[in-house]
Amino acid sequence: MKLLEQIEKWAIETPDQTAFVWRDAKITYKQLKEDSDALAHWISSEYPDDRSPIMVYGHMQPEMIINFLGCVKAGHAYIPVDLSIPADRVQRIAENSGAKLLLSGTEVTVTDLPVRIVSEDNLKDIFFTHKGKTPNPEHAVKGDENFYIIYTSGSTGNPKGVQITYNCLVSFTKWAVEDFNLQTGQVFLNQAPFSFDLSVMDIYPSLVTGGTLWAIDKDMIARPKDLFASLEQSDIQVWTSTPSFAEMCLMEASFSESMLPNMKTFLFCGEVLPNEVARKLIERFPKATIMNTYGPTEATVAVTGIHVTEEVLNQYKSLPVGYCKSDCRLLIMKEDGTIAPDGEKGEIVIVGPSVSVGYLGSPELTEKAFTMIDGERAYKTGDAGYVENGLLFYNGRLDFQIKLHGYRMELEEIEHHLRACSYVEGAVIVPIKKGEKYDYLLAVVVPGEHSFEKEFKLTSAIKKELNERLPNYMIPRKFMYQSSIPMTPNGKVDRKKLLSEVTA
């Protein structure tokens, strides 16, 4: 059964089942089908000979999901554009993508875009006037046609449009549902903005299994009282987020099985899952399964996964990121271009149907990052890692490795050991430059419970523990204490903001 057919069957079997909830707004599977059909019919009638991608603008409104499906039913890839994205970047996305149309479930604050804008009111008119009309199923996105395009940061300052095809998404969704043992009708957390591909991990596995997406927005996350009130009402069974977001939630004592009694599965992606975070989750949610996954946007969300058990936690201080999905494979490439043997570090290269067809309108960038290996698409991730007995271990970004006073080191390794210290709830390492070279390491720490009256005594205690785990040259010179670690709208640590704060 095709992906869209899998979603639409719930409009027949359970039409009144809620597909998506955001604050007081919700849509059923029946409404999702009717409105996305109406929109697809309108798009096809307005743009009969055009297949350019369509920008979908908003935050967590139910119209976002309707618009996504309406686009692909009409044969167009969609480009999710979150409200938090700066106007200049939205402008560059519009220009790079060649989009002619922007659908919005909210007010569009960006001006002078080179696209036709369909407002929230326009959309309601379309849903009403085209109700009951169905698009030609032959027009729907299929095969190696783009299903969605997500723009990620580019080293040149220009965003890169990662093209994910229908086949890429089908491969990911099938694997996620089967390997993570997702069941029919579950409630999925939707924490990541739609412009971040982690959101795909909950959207499509939920929709194909007749589940309910429970969306929480950035304003809720900024107000913990609202956040936990929403979570308490949700009855979430499948939790999808970055580890940083879960770590933030764990600072609330009531975040446990009593708040979410039916929690079945935690799915983590987008960042390293610290051992101590997984350990706390097992303590708070003893009946739930914790899955650690890995994958860049260019390989459709995730390509590896592992069930994190007590045994795994005790065996590995730095958690492995899992075994590769069966239709893909991993290669570890050495600097000379040869394949590294088991246990030897190198660059992680992903091969198989999960791999994107490249960056939209950027052939030079595509050629640099993508290649063909044995007739299959391959992506050079820029991530360091190694494989041992089929199990992938992630060792950070190759560009997260810094050289300090002649020593090469991984910032994430230092963060791992720092978080394991007593009196530390959360921590990020910020390398501070002097001129063109790194001068010292600053540790930004969210302290746990302690009885030290002075910060320097707390610092001494933490440093004493670090000295037992790390060589002296990896010990941060300075410590700064904060009540929380800033996060990006995507739920990752906002390293740029931290750097600007500490160097101001």
Curated annotation (Swiss-Prot):
ATP binds at T152, S153, N292, T293, Y294, G295, P296, T297, D383, Y394, N395, G396, R397, K492. CDD domains: DltA. It is found in: Cytoplasm. Its EC number is 6.2.1.54. Pathway: Cell wall biogenesis; lipoteichoic acid biosynthesis. The keyword Cytoplasm applies. GO terms for molecular function: ATP binding; D-alanine [D-alanyl carrier protein] ligase activity. One of its GO terms (biological process) is lipoteichoic acid biosynthetic process. Catalyzes the first step in the D-alanylation of lipoteichoic acid (LTA), the activation of D-alanine and its transfer onto the D-alanyl carrier protein (Dcp) DltC. In an ATP-dependent two-step reaction, forms a high energy D-alanyl-AMP intermediate, followed by transfer of the D-alanyl residue as a thiol ester to the phosphopantheinyl prosthetic group of the Dcp. D-alanylation of LTA plays an important role in modulating the properties of the cell wall in Gram-positive bacteria, influencing the net charge of the cell wall. This is D-alanine--D-alanyl carrier protein ligase. It comes from Bacillus cereus (strain AH187).
